[in-house]
């Protein structure tokens, strides 16, 4: 039985925390920022925790976590 490949796109976008939760960064925060409000840009800088509904999909993409 061959090894399962890790999805490299997902591996670059998601990090596992010490408690086992999945941390990720929001999109839309790198360019075309003039039209976005100060509050929106500030909120985009923060990292976020993945919800339980999407956790199953990420675990399938990253089998060796």
UniProtKB/Swiss-Prot annotation:
Pfam annotation, one family: Ribosomal_L35p
UniProt-recorded name of the protein: Large ribosomal subunit protein bL35
Region (Disordered): 1-23, 29-48
Swiss-Prot/TrEMBL GO biological process terms: translation
Family: Belongs to the bacterial ribosomal protein bL35 family.
GO cellular component labels: cytosolic large ribosomal subunit
InterPro entries assigned: Ribosomal_bL35, Ribosomal_bL35-like, Ribosomal_bL35_CS, Ribosomal_bL35_sf
């Amino acid at each position: 039985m061959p090894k399962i490949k890790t999805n490299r796109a997902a591996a670059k976008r998601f990090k596992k925390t010490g408690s086992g939760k999945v941390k990720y960064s929001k999109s839309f925060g790198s360019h075309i920022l003039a039209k976005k409000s100060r509050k929106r840009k500030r909120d985009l800088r923060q990292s976020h925790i993945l919800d339980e509904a999407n956790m199953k999909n990420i675990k399938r993409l990253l089998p060796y976590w």
